[in-house]
Amino acid sequence: MSTSRLYTLVLVLQPQRVLLGMKKRGFGAGRWNGFGGKVQEGETIEDGAKRELLEESGLRVDTLHKVGHISFEFVGSPELMDVHIFSTDHVHGTPTESEEMRPQWFQLDQIPFADMWPDDSYWFPLLLQKKKFCGHFKFHGQDTILSYSLREVDEF
């Protein structure tokens, strides 16, 4: 029986561009990703998302929109990653490099999928179309998707 742990992921989407961060250390290092991490005990999922965005990019946000919910399974790991994905189009502050992430804006037609998690190319198009989605990805290592399911949903 697997256990799961709550994680958040925040994508700052503005007209024609998205803010991603180059992960500098730890799990997923060397890949572009949104901003997020583990939800702490006593913290709501949305509060955890706001905290992680601030810690990793220096940006504050008033409103987040839940757009996705994906569980990730890694062969050999007993823990599922239960990831709640949010988007926002309005932030306060200027993106600032942290110990963990180096933020950079990308034009929507220049998203660096080759340097991102392999699953991103499956669900990112739904995000960009402002659709909500749920899914599950099973990985072998960090590069190979063994199986997946992904579907659009109306609400959470």
UniProtKB/Swiss-Prot annotation:
Record domain Nudix hydrolase: where: 3-132
Domain of life: Eukaryota
Compartments, as annotated in UniProt: Cytoplasm; Nucleus; Nucleus membrane; Cytoplasmic vesicle, Secretory vesicle, Acrosome
Family of this protein: Belongs to the Nudix hydrolase family.
Keyword set includes Hydrolase: yes
InterPro entries: 8ODP, Nudix_hydrolase, NUDIX_hydrolase-like_dom_sf, NUDIX_hydrolase_CS, NUDIX_hydrolase_dom
GO terms, molecular function: 2-hydroxy-ATP hydrolase activity; 2-hydroxy-dATP hydrolase activity; 8-oxo-7,8-dihydrodeoxyguanosine triphosphate pyrophosphatase activity; 8-oxo-7,8-dihydroguanosine triphosphate pyrophosphatase activity; ATP diphosphatase activity; dATP diphosphatase activity; hydrolase activity, acting on acid anhydrides, in phosphorus-containing anhydrides; metal ion binding
DNA-binding recorded as keyword: no
Keywords: Cytoplasm, Cytoplasmic vesicle, Hydrolase, Magnesium, Membrane, Metal-binding, Nucleus, RNA-binding
Reaction(s) this enzyme catalyzes, per UniProt: 2-oxo-dATP + H2O = 2-oxo-dAMP + diphosphate + H(+); 2-oxo-ATP + H2O = 2-oxo-AMP + diphosphate + H(+); 8-oxo-dGTP + H2O = 8-oxo-dGMP + diphosphate + H(+); 8-oxo-dATP + H2O = 8-oxo-dAMP + diphosphate + H(+)
Residues the entry annotates as binding Mg(2+) 2: 52, 55
Tissue distribution: Expressed in liver in hepatocytes and weakly in Kupffer's cells. Expression detected in testes in primary and secondary spermatocytes and interstitial cells. High expression levels detected in the inner cortex of kidney, with lower levels detected in the tubules of the outer cortex, medulla, renal pelvis and glomeruli (at protein level). Expressed in heart, brain, spleen, lung, liver, skeletal muscle, kidney and testis.
Binding site for Mg(2+) 1: 36, 56, 100
EC identifiers of the protein: 3.6.1.56, 3.6.1.-
Assembly, per entry: Monomer.
Binding residues for 8-oxo-dGTP: 23
This protein's name: Oxidized purine nucleoside triphosphate hydrolase
An annotated GO cellular component: cytoplasm
Residues at which 2-oxo-dATP binds: 8, 33, 35-38, 117-120
Name of encoding gene: Nudt1
Names of the cofactor(s): Mg(2+)
Main function: Oxidized purine nucleoside triphosphate hydrolase which is a prominent sanitizer of the oxidized nucleotide pool. Catalyzes the hydrolysis of 2-oxo-dATP (2-hydroxy-dATP) into 2-oxo-dAMP. Also has a significant hydrolase activity toward 2-oxo-ATP, 8-oxo-dGTP and 8-oxo-dATP. Through the hydrolysis of oxidized purine nucleoside triphosphates, prevents their incorporation into DNA and the subsequent transversions A:T to C:G and G:C to T:A. Also catalyzes the hydrolysis of methylated purine nucleoside triphosphate preventing their integration into DNA.
GO BP field: DNA protection; male gonad development; purine nucleoside catabolic process; response to cadmium ion
Alphabetized SUPFAM superfamilies for the sequence: Nudix
Organism: Rattus norvegicus
